[in-house]
Amino acid sequence: MRLSLAAAISHGRVYRRLGLGPESRIHLLRNLLTGLVRHERIEATWARADEMRGYAEKLIDYGKLGDTNERAMRMADFWLTEKDLIPKLFKVLAPRFQGQNGNYTRMLQIPNRKEQDRAKMAVIEYKGNYLPPLPLPHRDSNLTLLNQLLLGLQQDLHHNQDASLHSSCTVQTPKT
C-alpha cells in the first residue's frame, strides 16, 4: 500500500476563496479595507488579513497618485464602502507614505480564537499610525530544536570530560 499526501492543487486559483463565492469575497475585502482605513489597525483571521494586505498596499499606491487622478478616485470609490474615508486616504495616508515604495502595512500574529473555532488570528495595521505600538513577540531562542540539541551535546561533552578526568586521577597501585 502506498501512502500519499493530498496536495492542494489550485488549478489556476491565485487567491483565497474566503467565503461563499467571488461576490462575497469582494464584499468581505471591501469591508476589511474600509475598517483598516478608518481605524488604521484591525484584527481579523490570518487568512483574511493576509489576503487583504495586498489590496491595502495597492490602495495606498493609488492614493499616492492624488485625488486628481481619475483611476485613483475610481479605485478608492470602489474599495472604500464609507465615502467619508476617501479624503483620509488622499490627505492623510498617502502623504505619510509618499517617500516609501511598498511595505506600508505590518501584520502580527496574535493568540488564536478560543471560544469559537480556534482560528489563527492576526492584527494588520498601517505603519506610522497614531495608535500605541504593538508589543513584538519575543521568541526564546533557547527553545529551538537546534539549540536544544547543541545544549545536549555540550552536556554530554562535559560529562565525558569529567568522567575521563576521574578515571585518570585514580592511580592504580600494584599489589605486592
Swiss-Prot record:
Stored Pfam families: Ribosomal_L17
SUPFAM superfamilies given in the database record: Prokaryotic ribosomal protein L17 (SSF64263)
Record's protein name: Large ribosomal subunit protein bL17m
GO annotation, cellular component aspect: mitochondrial inner membrane; mitochondrial large ribosomal subunit; mitochondrion
Chain segment of the transit peptide: 1-8
Entry similarity comment: Belongs to the bacterial ribosomal protein bL17 family.
Keyword Signal tagged: no
Keywords: Mitochondrion, Ribonucleoprotein, Ribosomal protein, Transit peptide
Single GO BP term: mitochondrial translation
Superkingdom, natural source: Eukaryota
PANTHER family: LARGE RIBOSOMAL SUBUNIT PROTEIN BL17M, RIBOSOMAL PROTEIN L17
Predominant place of localization: mitochondrion
Source organism: Mus musculus (Mouse)
Localisation: Mitochondrion
Summary of subunit composition and partner proteins: Component of the mitochondrial ribosome large subunit (39S) which comprises a 16S rRNA and about 50 distinct proteins.
Lineage, highest ranks first: Eukaryota, Metazoa, Chordata, Craniata, Vertebrata
GO molecular function: protein domain specific binding; structural constituent of ribosome
Keyword Amino-acid biosynthesis assigned: no
